[in-house]
Design a protein with these regions (language model features):
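Contiguous interface-forming segments/domains that mediate binding rather than catalysis
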Residues: 3-4, 12-15, 36-39, 55-60, ...
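A structural detector for beta-sheet-dominated domains
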Residues: 20-22, 31, 52, 69, ...
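Short, conserved beta-turn/loop elements at beta-strand boundaries and strand-helix junctions
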Residues: 34-39, 82-86
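Short, compact, well-ordered microdomains
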Residues: 61-95
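Acidic, aromatic-enriched beta-alpha/helix-loop junctions
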Residues: 39-70
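Short linear regulatory motifs enriched in tryptophan with gly/pro/ser
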Residues: 4-6, 23, 27-29, 48, ...
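N-terminal trafficking/processing presequences and adjacent post-cleavage segments
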Residues: 1-33
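Surface-exposed, interaction-prone regions used to assemble/regulate multi-protein complexes
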Residues: 28-31, 37-43
Length: 95
């Protein structure tokens, strides 16, 4: 499993990742990455990632398994933060 970094997600902006759901997978788009101020408790920089899921998404927060475009696996905890008629926006926080 790959270690999530801001650099990793910044390279994925505009690309889709496949996220496992009950009964299959969904394509979620990596929309943006926000680097936050580094603090003394970490050696790396905290960051947030914003993903766009299909409007038909289950809209639940929780741990998700995904596959990146390069085939690597990644687990993350996603929280839905907004919805439109076209998509559900999720936030991932890496403190």
């Amino acid at each position: 499993m790959i270690i999530p970094t801001a650099d990793l997600f910044e390279a994925l902006v505009g690309q889709d990742i496949n996220v496992s759901i009950a009964g299959g997978t969904e394509s979620w788009r990596v929309v943006s990455v926000k680097r936050r101020e580094q603090h003394s408790l970490r050696t790396d920089q905290p960051f947030n990632v914003y993903l766009s899921a299909p409007a038909s998404n289950d809209r639940r927060q929780g741990t998700r398994s995904s596959t990146l475009p390069n085939g690597e696996s990644l687990e993350f905890f996603g929280v839905p933060v907004s919805a439109t008629k076209d998509a559900i926006s999720y936030e991932l926080v890496f403190n």
